[in-house]
């Protein structure tokens, strides 16, 4: 009878561990969901060739129109349906941006933007399409409601590449 009792205790312990793991997973998911920040992705801009032209990657966090305009210009094309910032929107928004430069074109896919006690974390995936004939400056431009923050972490393809404080 004793081996059955031990077996029952082992089974009970395994069940308890599984329940705890499931609870923990849902708790982490709810916390991440709660910390998400609403954001908007903007397009229809080119990067000024005077803005940090020698750097392979640049980062911008601003709510000042003058700084934004020093980095970006409006790219007009026929049939344009770009999502540009509305005039005056930087009075109530912050722009978070990264710019990749090189002989490739970039496709960005934003995974999430979260706020953990003032530490913003921008997670995105980047796919490069190589070019043998041209150099590109590819911006990812995001706006969020104006909030207090301590730092912004840029996490590209799962790796921390910059922590701006």
PLM regions with names:
Residues 25-165:
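Exposed, flexible binding/inhibitory loops of compact, secreted disulfide-stabilized domains
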């Amino acid at each position: 009878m004793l081996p059955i009792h031990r077996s029952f205790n082992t089974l009970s312990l395994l069940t308890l561990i599984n329940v705890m793991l499931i609870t923990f997973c849902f708790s982490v998911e709810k916390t991440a969901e709660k910390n998400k920040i609403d954001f908007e992705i903007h397009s229809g801009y080119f990067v000024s060739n005077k803005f940090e032209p020698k750097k392979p990657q640049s980062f911008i966090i601003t709510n000042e129109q003058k700084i934004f305009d020093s980095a970006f210009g409006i790219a007009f094309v026929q049939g344009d349906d770009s999502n540009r910032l509305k005039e005056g929107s930087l009075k109530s928004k912050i722009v978070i941006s990264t710019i990749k430069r090189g002989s490739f074109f970039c496709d960005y896919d934003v995974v999430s933007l979260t706020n953990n006690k003032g530490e913003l974390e921008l997670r995105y995936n980047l796919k490069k399409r190589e070019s043998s004939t041209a150099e590109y400056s590819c911006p990812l431009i995001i706006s969020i409601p104006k909030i207090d923050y301590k730092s912004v972490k840029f996490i590209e393809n799962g790796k921390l590449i910059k922590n701006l404080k």
